[in-house]
């Protein structure tokens, strides 16, 4: 009610001073804060009928068209990026992000902001480089203001985003460095003060290790000492170990870790979140992924694939978040193991959905031009001797592979055999 009241109170002020860029920014932000994180029904690709997204968009697009100085207004640029990121057309804010990146060079959050759009448009190199630049700016601010303040969450956010971009690029070194720096920004003291906010960031490392098939390193991961504090981390480490042991052919150890995961999951409170999603909801995806790979690797391939399909369903129904709470798209594992059993037809559908080629997924759920899904789709198209799509996909794949620092042989390193190199 307070957000509605403020928006209503600002409207006549905006109408009287409709050429004042600062007041326009305040009014637009008030409109957007009526339904934060719910500006759009992104599953349907339409504005939230209970919100004011269309009014905010009309005002902002008009002001950028009518007032050249609007392109130098950090607040207006910032608002437009947030407005469009859940929309069906995030690319409309690309130019706004490009300008904002350099406009306030000493504000790390604003240096980072463009990557909310970059990631949705498949520009993962910008996602990585701009967030690393923002992190450097953050370090300067930390020297000035100290580490224990509200801005700590923004420092973490930038490094989390850098990790996410590196994973999509296939840049193992950058992903490992980002997740290491991320952990350093979340000391035990901070987690103890705000466990429901900060603890889930500590659990990022297992995702990176799985993305790059670091099975031996995963089996050597230690469970957190304080399992009551690090409840999400404890569960995710067991998940990662179950997946790792399954891929190493150690099926008894994998099943044991799967049981330990179930016990750990039971202790995760409903209050624990990763931004807009409950930890328990995110860990449900981990459970299906884990059961899928454990079953598949032990020879129960049909059962395993069904679990992975369920993981995809859960992944698709997470609340919007940037970056997404589940950093390795579930379709990458499903597609890889479908190819392993020779189901090229379903795998092609899986990869096209992930890349956004067929438009079946909501726009914010698509991962355009990512090297992993491009590799899988290229294999599918080559297998059926496609002559139309294959050259285009091959061109995109060559560009994406040129930026990875590892050889990409499959969309997920859980794939144990490949007829394709």
Language-model regions, residue ranges each:
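Residue at a conserved register position within TPR or TPR-like alpha-solenoid repeats
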Residues: 31, 83-84, 118, 166, ...
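TPR/TPR-like (Sel1-like) alpha-helical repeat modules
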Residues: 119, 128-139, 166-184, 255-266, ...
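"A position-specific structural signal for the A-helix of alpha-solenoid helical repeats
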Residues: 26, 79, 113, 120, ...
